[in-house]
C-alpha cells in the first residue's frame, strides 16, 4: 500500500494537465501531417457508412427484457451500435476536417443527450430507466466519456452550430456522472477489480473536459486518485489479473489510461523502480499469450484469441519502457494491417470503438511506425500469487488459486494444452451473459462448473465456489507444477490429498500425474478433459485426437466420449466451431490411495 501511495503521489503531481492540452483539436495540422494517409482514409471510409443514417432510439420494451426474460444482449446490440455510429463519425471528421460529418455528429449527440440513462439494463434496478436515478456504472460512464471526448475534439465546430449544445453536453455529463460520482460512496471506488479503473478512466475524461468548477474538479481528482490506489493495493505483486486476459483490457489497461489522462506522462518520465507493480500488471497480457493468435482464456473470457488492443497496449508499453509489450503491439498491428485497416482495429477496441484510447495511440503513431514487431512467446511464466504457470512446447497453462476470484469459474487445478499454438485440451470460456451470469444461479451455468474443465470429479463431488476452496502449491520449477487441489472440493468428498502434477517433457509431451488419498470411497472417481477435436477410441490405452494422442493405463482407466455440442451457444460456437467433446476417464479401482498417470503426445 505504501508503494502504491508513493507511486500515485508521483504520477498525479503535474495537474497542470487540466489545461486540457492532451489532444490536438479538429483542424490542427497534426491530423494531416502526422497520421499516414492510408490510415486517415480508413477512418474516413469507416465513418462514411454512417452518413445520413438515422439515429435510432433505444426501445424501452427492449430495455425491460432483462428483468422480464433475462436477456441482456438485445439491448446491448442496439446501444453499442449507436455508440459505434458516433465514434466512427467523429474519427472520420477529425481525419478529413471538412465538416462533412458534422450534421450527423450533432444529430447523434442530441439523440444521446435525450436518452433517459446511458447504461445497461443489467446494471439497473428497475425494468425501465428513470431520469432521477443516475447511478454511475460502467457503460453510462463510458458513454459519457465518448460524448466528452467528442465535445473536446470538436468543441469549436459544435459551438459554431450552437453554444447551447455545448452547454447541454456539460449539463448532462454533470447530472449523469460528475455530480453523482463525487457525492456517492460507490462500492467500486474501493474495488480491486475492473469496475474501479474502467469507470475511473471515463470519469477522468469527463472531469478533464466537462468539469468547470475548480473545487469540484480538485475533489474529483482526489477521489479518482484514491480509487486508483485502492485498486493497485488490492492487486497481487505478480501483476496477475484473476479476471482473466479478457478483462485485463479494462483492469490494468484502464488504470494506465486513467493515469495517462491525469498526468499526461511524458516519454522522459522515470517511473522505475516505483512502478514495479504497474510493470507486472502490464506484462500479464503478453505472459498469457500462447501463439498463433491465441491467448490463455481462464475466467470469463468471451474468446480464446489474443486480446491486446494496440491503441492502449502500445502506449502502455511505451510509457513503462517495456520493449516486449511495444513490439507485441506492433506485431498485432502488422498482422491486422493497421496502416490500411486502422478503422477495423479501432472498431474492435471495445464494446464500441474507444475514441479516447485511439486519440492516445495516435499521439505516438510515428514512434509506433518505427518500432520492430515481435510476437511474444515466453518459454515459461510463473505467477506465484495467482498460481498460474505456463510452459512450452507444447504450450501448457495450469492454474491454482481459489474459487472466489472475480469472474470466477470453479477451475482450481485446471490446465489447457495448445500444441503448436492450436487448441487441444481447452477451457470452454464463457458464453453469452444472461441474468444468471452474475446471480446466485451462476454455478448452474455449465461453463462455470469444474466438471466442464480439465479436472477430476472426486468421490461423486465437483468443486465448490468460494474463496475458501483453493489450491496449495506443493512444487514449482520450470515446466513443472504440483498442486494439492483437495481444498477446492467440499469436505463431503472425503479427500486427504489430491496432488496433480503437470509436467512438460522432451519430445513435445505433457505428462499429468494424479496422486491421491481418500478417507473413504463413495463413488467412482473420474478425470474430465474438454476438447474441440473429435476423440477416437481406436485401441485400449490410447485416444486419438487428430494428430495427437492421449495415452493412459487401460488397467486403471475406462474412457468414454461425450459430445457436448448441444450446450454451446452462439458465442461458444464462434470460439470452438461446430463441436465440443468431453472425455471421461473413470478409475476402475476403489482403492483409497492411488497414483494415475496419463500423457499427451
Predicted segments with their positions:
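CBM-like, beta-strand-rich accessory domains located in the C-terminal region of large
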Residues: 301, 337, 342-345, 433-601
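Carbohydrate-active enzyme catalytic cores, enriched for enzymes
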Residues: 253-425
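Non-membrane alpha-helical segments in proteins
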Residues: 81-95, 107-111, 141-152
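Structural helix-adjacent loops and short alpha-helical linkers that scaffold large soluble proteins
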Residues: 93-106, 150-171, 207-225, 262-278, ...
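Active-site lining segments of carbohydrate-active enzymes
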Residues: 128-246, 254-257, 369-376
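Long, well-ordered core segments of solenoidal/helical folds
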Residues: 47-58, 105-123, 164-186, 219-239, ...
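Low-complexity, Ser/Thr/Pro/Gly-enriched N-terminal "stalk/linker" regions
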Residues: 21-67
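Bacterial Sec-dependent N-terminal signal peptides
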Residues: 1-20
Amino acid at each position: 500500500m505504501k508503494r502504491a501511495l508513493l507511486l500515485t503521489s508521483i504520477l498525479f503531481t503535474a495537474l497542470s494537465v487540466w489545461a486540457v492540452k492532451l489532444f490536438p483539436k479538429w483542424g490542427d495540422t497534426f491530423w494531416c501531417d502526422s497520421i499516414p494517409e492510408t490510415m486517415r482514409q480508413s477512418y474516413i471510409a469507416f465513418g462514411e457508412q454512417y452518413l445520413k443514417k438515422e439515429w435510432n432510439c433505444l426501445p424501452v420494451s427492449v430495455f425491460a427484457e432483462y428483468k422480464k426474460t433475462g436477456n441482456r444482449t438485445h439491448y446491448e446490440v442496439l446501444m453499442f451500435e449507436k455508440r459505434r455510429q458516433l465514434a466512427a463519425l467523429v474519427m472520420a471528421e477529425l481525419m478529413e476536417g471538412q465538416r462533412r460529418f458534422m450534421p450527423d455528429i450533432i444529430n447523434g449527440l442530441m439523440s444521446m443527450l435525450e436518452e433517459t440513462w446511458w447504461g445497461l439494463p443489467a446494471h439497473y434496478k428497475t425494468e425501465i430507466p428513470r431520469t432521477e436515478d443516475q447511478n454511475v456504472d460502467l457503460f453510462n460512464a463510458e458513454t459519457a466519456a465518448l460524448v466528452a471526448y467528442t465535445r473536446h475534439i470538436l468543441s469549436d465546430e459544435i459551438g459554431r452550430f450552437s453554444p447551447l449544445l455545448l452547454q447541454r453536453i456539460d449539463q448532462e455529463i454533470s447530472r449523469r456522472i460528475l455530480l453523482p460520482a463525487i457525492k456517492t460512496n460507490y462500492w467500486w471506488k474501493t474495488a480491486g477489480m475492473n469496475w474501479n479503473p474502467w469507470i475511473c478512466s471515463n470519469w477522468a475524461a469527463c472531469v478533464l473536459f466537462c468539469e468547470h468548477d475548480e473545487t469540484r474538479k480538485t475533489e474529483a481528482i482526489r477521489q479518482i486518485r484514491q480509487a486508483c490506489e485502492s485498486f493497485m493495493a488490492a492487486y497481487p505483486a505478480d501483476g496477475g489479473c484473476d479476471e482473466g486476459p479478457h478483462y485485463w483490457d479494462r483492469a490494468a489497461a484502464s488504470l494506465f489510461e486513467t493515469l495517462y489522462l491525469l498526468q499526461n506522462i511524458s516519454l522522459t518520465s522515470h517511473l522505475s523502480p516505483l512502478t514495479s507493480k504497474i510493470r507486472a500488471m502490464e506484462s500479464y497480457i503478453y505472459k498469457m499469450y500462447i501463439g498463433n493468435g491465441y491467448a490463455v482464456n481462464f475466467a470469463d473470457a468471451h474468446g480464446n484469441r489474443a486480446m491486446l488492443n494496440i491503441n492502449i497496449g502500445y502506449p502502455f508499453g511505451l510509457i513503462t519502457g517495456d520493449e516486449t509489450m511495444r513490439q507485441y503491439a506492433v506485431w498485432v498491428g502488422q498482422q491486422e494491417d493497421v496502416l490500411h485497416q486502422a478503422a477495423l482495429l479501432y472498431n474492435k477496441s471495445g464494446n464500441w470503438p474507444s475514441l479516447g484510447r485511439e486519440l492516445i495511440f495516435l499521439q505516438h503513431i510515428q514512434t509506433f511506425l518505427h518500432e520492430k514487431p515481435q510476437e511474444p512467446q515466453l518459454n515459461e511464466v510463473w505467477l506465484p500469487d495467482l498460481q498460474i504457470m505456463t510452459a512450452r512446447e507444447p504450450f501448457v497453462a495450469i492454474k491454482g488459486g481459489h474459487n472466489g476470484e472475480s469472474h470466477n469459474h470453479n477451475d482450481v487445478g485446471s490446465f489447457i494444452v495448445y500444441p503448436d499454438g492450436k487448441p487441444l485440451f481447452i477451457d470452454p470460456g464463457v458464453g453469452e451473459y444472461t441474468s444468471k451470469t452474475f446471480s446466485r444461479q451462476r454455478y448452474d451455468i455449465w461453463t462455470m462448473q469444474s466438471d466442464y474443465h480439465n479436472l477430476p470429479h472426486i468421490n461423486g463431488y465437483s468443486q465448490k465456489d468460494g474463496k475458501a476452496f483453493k489450491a496449495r502449491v506443493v512444487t514449482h520449477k520450470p515446466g513443472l507444477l504440483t498442486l494439492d487441489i483437495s481444498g477446492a472440493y467440499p469436505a463431503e468428498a472425503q479427500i486427504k490429498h489430491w496432488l496433480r502434477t503437470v509436467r512438460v517433457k522432451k519430445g513435445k509431451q505433457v505428462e499429468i500425474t494424479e496422486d491421491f488419498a481418500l478417507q473413504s470411497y463413495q463413488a467412482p472417481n473420474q478425470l474430465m478433459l474438454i476438447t474441440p477435436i473429435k476423440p477416437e477410441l481406436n485401441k485400449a490405452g490410447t485416444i486419438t485426437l487428430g494428430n495427437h494422442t492421449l495415452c493412459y493405463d487401460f488397467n486403471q482407466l475406462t474412457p468414454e466420449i461425450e459430445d457436448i455440442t448441444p450446450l454451446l451457444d452462439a458465442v461458444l460456437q464462434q470460439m470452438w466451431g461446430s463441436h465440443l467433446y468431453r472425455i471421461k476417464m473413470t478409475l476402475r479401482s476403489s482403492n483409497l490411495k492411488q497414483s494415475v498417470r496419463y500423457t499427451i503426445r
